[in-house]
Curated annotation (Swiss-Prot):
InterPro entries: Ribosomal_uL16 (IPR047873), Ribosomal_uL16_bact-type (IPR000114), Ribosomal_uL16_CS (IPR020798), Ribosomal_uL16_dom (IPR016180), Ribosomal_uL16_sf (IPR036920). Belongs to the universal ribosomal protein uL16 family. It comes from the Bacteria. This is Large ribosomal subunit protein uL16. Keywords: Ribonucleoprotein, Ribosomal protein, RNA-binding, rRNA-binding, tRNA-binding. One of its GO terms (cellular component) is cytosolic large ribosomal subunit. Binds 23S rRNA and is also seen to make contacts with the A and possibly P site tRNAs. GO terms for biological process: translation. The lineage of its organism: Bacteria, Bacillati, Bacillota, Bacilli, Lactobacillales.
Length: 137
């Protein structure tokens, strides 16, 4: 699973998810991509589940690029603990994804296979997404 090797601060502020993604809005490595149409936090487990769904459907053919990384920690208090007494313990890692960001890219397979693989991956993610092709240069 994807986790940072080391971080400067264990507990981060939640931050705001305003507007569109600044960069990474075009397919740059592969031929086809999965672009987010809504903003959300995506956990490292969801990224891994989407990756497995894609690679299993493609029968280990083609190449997959994961263009998001869960660098932000989120915290949670234990169940049954009263409010107050500081921030909770780090619970997991998330990748904040804004709308417009291309999350996954695929190359080396036909468009039909890529479309279905990315559709299966999109069911594992909490964001609405669409299939995009590389722009002709």
């Amino acid at each position: 699973m994807l986790v940072p090797k080391r971080v400067k601060h264990r507990r981060e502020f939640r931050g705001k998810m305003r507007g569109e993604a600044k960069g990474g809005k075009e397919v740059s490595f592969g031929e086809y991509g999965l672009q987010a149409t809504t903003s959300h936090w995506i956990t490292n487990r969801q990224i891994e589940a989407a990756r497995i769904a894609m690679t299993r459907y493609m029968k280990r053919g083609g190449k997959v690029w994961i263009k998001i990384f869960p660098h932000k920690s989120y915290t949670a208090k234990a169940i049954g603990v009263r409010m107050g007494s500081g921030k909770g313990a780090p619970e997991g890692w998330v990748a904040p994804v804004k709308r417009g960001k291309v999350m996954f890219e695929i190359a080396g397979v036909s468009e039909e296979v890529a479309r279905e693989a990315l559709r299966l991956a999109s069911h594992k993610l909490p964001v609405k997404s669409k299939f995009v092709k590389r722009e002709a240069e």
